[in-house]
Amino acid sequence: MTLTNYVQEVSLADFGKPLHHKAYWNKRLKTTGGRFFPKDGHLDFNPRMLEEHGELIFRKIVRHELCHYHLYFEGRGYHHKDRDFKDLLAQVNGLRYVPTSSKSKTNHHYSCQTCGQVYQRKRRINLAKYVCGNCHGKLMEKNQS
């Protein structure tokens, strides 16, 4: 079953309305479960949400995006702040927010050679330029095993 067919099935089962546009996987999405594009009507979904959280959570994410979709084409308020959107989302039991990822976001671990203070960073830092904030000691990168 393709993604578009799955979204069409959810639309008919949960909203009683057909989907007239396509749905696509978009692996560039990092912090969101999906996106609705009012300009051309297509939907994008994050494939990692299905992999990490399972089909039940993914179905709720699809419902969320379909709320945007159907309200937009009905000419009603389709933004998160609109009462129409909040009411429809509660009615179909969709997710308001995407669950956080279970993966750790810190990639680089540093420690001070003098006081032992540990620093975790997403981005790499220049060890020749930066020192410990506590004691001004030299930093070293910890091995990740």
Swiss-Prot record:
What GO CC terms are in its UniProt record? cytoplasm
Disulfide pairings? none
The active-site annotation reads E65
Which biological process, per GO, is one annotated for this protein? Answer: response to stress
Name of this protein? Protein SprT-like
Q: Which GO terms describe its molecular function?
A: zinc ion binding
Annotated compartments: Cytoplasm
* Positions contributing to Zn(2+) binding: H64, H68
Q: Which organism is it from?
A: Streptococcus pyogenes serotype M1
Q: Give the InterPro entries listed for this entry.
A: SprT-like_domain, Uncharacterised_SprT-like
